């Protein structure tokens, strides 16, 4: 069975188009993840972080959904699906937590963000 050069060319173009389309879909889905994290830490050393149930209660009472609440060292990390949820939670927690806690947005260095930063930085080195 002999395959004509025209058929091979069409097959190779089709495979290249399929690979490019797959790569574009993969990049697009990676960019759509906009996870956001709030970090709550005490101002003074030795003070404890707020109770996770207390945080859950106040966020739930205000209709703010979150992915997880995790204590890590002397910090309480709250993960959200979007930065809008994180900003709304910061407003609620600023009102409801007693003084003595720092509530800050924490940058999530996901693999996607790291690779995009590398690609952006390397493009400026050419030329």
From Swiss-Prot:
The keyword Transcription regulation is annotated on this UniProt entry: no
A single Gene Ontology CC term: plasma membrane
Domain of life: Bacteria
Database matches in InterPro entries: Modulator_MzrA, SecD-TM
One example GO MF annotation: protein kinase binding
Similarity-based family: Belongs to the MzrA family.
Complexes and interactors: Interacts with EnvZ.
Protein name: Modulator protein MzrA
Source species: Enterobacter sp. (strain 638)
Lineage: Bacteria, Pseudomonadati, Pseudomonadota, Gammaproteobacteria, Enterobacterales
């Amino acid at each position: 069975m002999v395959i004509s050069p025209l058929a091979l060319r069409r097959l190779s173009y089709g495979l290249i188009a399929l690979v490019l389309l797959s790569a574009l879909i993969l990049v697009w889905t990676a960019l759509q993840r906009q996870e956001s994290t709030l970090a709550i830490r005490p101002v003074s050393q030795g003070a404890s972080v707020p109770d996770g149930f207390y945080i859950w209660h106040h966020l739930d009472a205000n209709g703010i959904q979150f992915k997880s609440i995790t204590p890590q060292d002397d910090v309480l990390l709250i993960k959200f699906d979007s930065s809008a949820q994180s900003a709304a939670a910061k407003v609620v927690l600023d009102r409801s937590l007693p003084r003595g806690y720092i509530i800050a947005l924490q940058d999530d260095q996901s693999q996607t963000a790291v690779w995009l930063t590398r690609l952006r930085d390397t493009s400026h080195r050419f030329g």
